[in-house]
């Protein structure tokens, strides 16, 4: 089970939100590159970046910070980015910077053809991000909840060549309330695409539960507030996950 530290970028700084609310931002670092190096030194084997401003604006907004992170760690570990990936040109430009993968979120819901086209243009490097509130997909930086169920959406992408699906339970994100294991497993069992859990990771019991769900197609988990506030020691958690594989 791969644990992936999240670095959420807002106006060039590393922050964490609660339930995706920009006004609920806690600043953890003024140097995202130093944060990236820290997680690499703690044993991270991949990093998850989110351009929060980009998610709301529709185009990435934190290019200097992203470049600094890539300069610091991209030679050692893969880095993925979501937030503002709404067209092929933007996706290509950011992959050319040295990102390993990009995450298509809002555009995957609004324009599923983009996912298909991106997978053809950049094979193996496209991740779909599905964010849900009570099972229904949310878009535009979680500002709008649609009438689409995430499982129905996920099934659309099965034959497109999507690398994986990141499933975020908005109600749990940043709330330290535990991962929604049931919903994550239900999604993973419904599609042939590996699913990465996100939102709510709180303690080692969540790690154990996620590892037990690996057989259902849950391939990893993204962790944010828990490792920043110290309720989970990242190195210890990854060692536990490795021991349970």
Curated annotation (Swiss-Prot):
What are its GO biological-process terms?
L-histidine biosynthetic process; L-tryptophan biosynthetic process
**Keyword hit for Glycosyltransferase:** no
Compartments in which it is found: Cytoplasm
State the Gene Ontology terms under molecular function.
1-(5-phosphoribosyl)-5-[(5-phosphoribosylamino)methylideneamino]imidazole-4-carboxamide isomerase activity
User: What are the GO cellular component annotations?
Assistant: cytoplasm
On the tree of life, the source organism's domain of life is Bacteria
In this protein, the active site sits at 8, 131
Question: Which Enzyme Commission numbers does its entry carry?
Answer: 5.3.1.16
Q: Which reaction does it catalyse?
A: 1-(5-phospho-beta-D-ribosyl)-5-[(5-phospho-beta-D-ribosylamino)methylideneamino]imidazole-4-carboxamide = 5-[(5-phospho-1-deoxy-D-ribulos-1-ylimino)methylamino]-1-(5-phospho-beta-D-ribosyl)imidazole-4-carboxamide
Disulfide pattern: none
Main subcellular localization, coarse class? Answer: cytoplasm
What pathway is this protein a component of? Amino-acid biosynthesis; L-histidine biosynthesis; L-histidine from 5-phospho-alpha-D-ribose 1-diphosphate: step 4/9
Q: Which HAMAP family did the record assign?
A: HisA
Q: What is this protein called?
A: 1-(5-phosphoribosyl)-5-[(5-phosphoribosylamino)methylideneamino] imidazole-4-carboxamide isomerase
> What organism does the UniProt record list as the source?
Neisseria gonorrhoeae (strain ATCC 700825 / FA 1090)
